[in-house]
Amino acid sequence: MLGITVLAAILACASCCGNPAFPPNLSTRVVGGEDAVPNSWPWQVSLQYLKDDTWRHTCGGSLITTSHVLTAAHCINKDFTYRVGLGKYNLTVEDEEGSVYAEVDTIYVHEKWNRLFLWNDIAIIKLAEPVELSNTIQVACIPEEGSLLPQDYPCYVTGWGRLWTNGPIAEVLQQGLQPIVSHATCSRLDWWFIKVRKTMVCAGGDGVISACNGDSGGPLNCQAEDGSWQVHGIVSFGSSSGCNVHKKPVVFTRVSAYNDWINEKIQL
């Protein structure tokens, strides 16, 4: 019963999740995106690893409880030491107002993660201590199990990834409009074909706006009818030809295919 209760609370309490104090700017059209409104995606985190006594951004992630972050399995290296930046906007400002850095307790990588085919590209990071929620740090909503969005449903990818193919990492959080691409379209021969499984979701592919290196693990944010924001995808992979290739939309791990797994891990 406890396991059912915890995830049900994340799903059902729209006022408890996915409602930023500073609403995002949705009037615009990440690569080809724009600077986000500060703290308008307050569940977005920066996953950082320690190298040469310096913390470096490697991936994004989403805070889904006060103690757990959802990210991609391919972001995790068992030999690295990680920390999680929460409430961040500008990565070049270490002591940014409203931000905190959390130590990591445990990282759960999906047991069937396949590095070759990028199947089950999902991981959960348990923080050493629960974080205190605020206007700059909030939890994201999780969609209901099996939830599928229709073709062209407007969603937003967010992150500090490269501003263009082989370009610099973004200093401030970026956002980009990424409409949903149906599985039927995304699995066409001239799109992603058999690389895309039904446990994945595609978005974008217009050749203009896209996620890029450094956005991995971050959220695909989609607004529900009640106005709350749900994380429907985790940035998984894109085209080796570049970050914004026509008919090669970003492929995300579909969160609603993993509700049971998420629920199991947040109980540990």
UniProtKB/Swiss-Prot annotation:
Specify the protein name.
Chymotrypsin-C
**Active-site residues (renumbered):** 74, 121, 216
Residue stretch(es) of the prosequence:
17-29
Q: What start and end residues bound the annotated signal peptide?
A: 1-16
Query: What family does this belong to?
Result: Belongs to the peptidase S1 family. Elastase subfamily.
Give the SUPFAM superfamilies listed for this entry. Trypsin-like serine proteases (SSF50494)
Q: What is its EC number?
A: 3.4.21.2
Q: Provide the disulphide bond pattern.
A: 17-141, 59-75, 155-222, 186-202, 212-243
- Tissue localization of expression: Pancreas.
Do the record's keywords include Ribosomal protein? Answer: no
What does the record list as GO biological process?
intracellular calcium ion homeostasis; proteolysis
Peptidase S1 domain residues: 30-267
Concerning Gene3D superfamilies, the annotation shows: Trypsin-like serine proteases
- What catalytic reaction does the record list? Preferential cleavage: Leu-|-Xaa, Tyr-|-Xaa, Phe-|-Xaa, Met-|-Xaa, Trp-|-Xaa, Gln-|-Xaa, Asn-|-Xaa
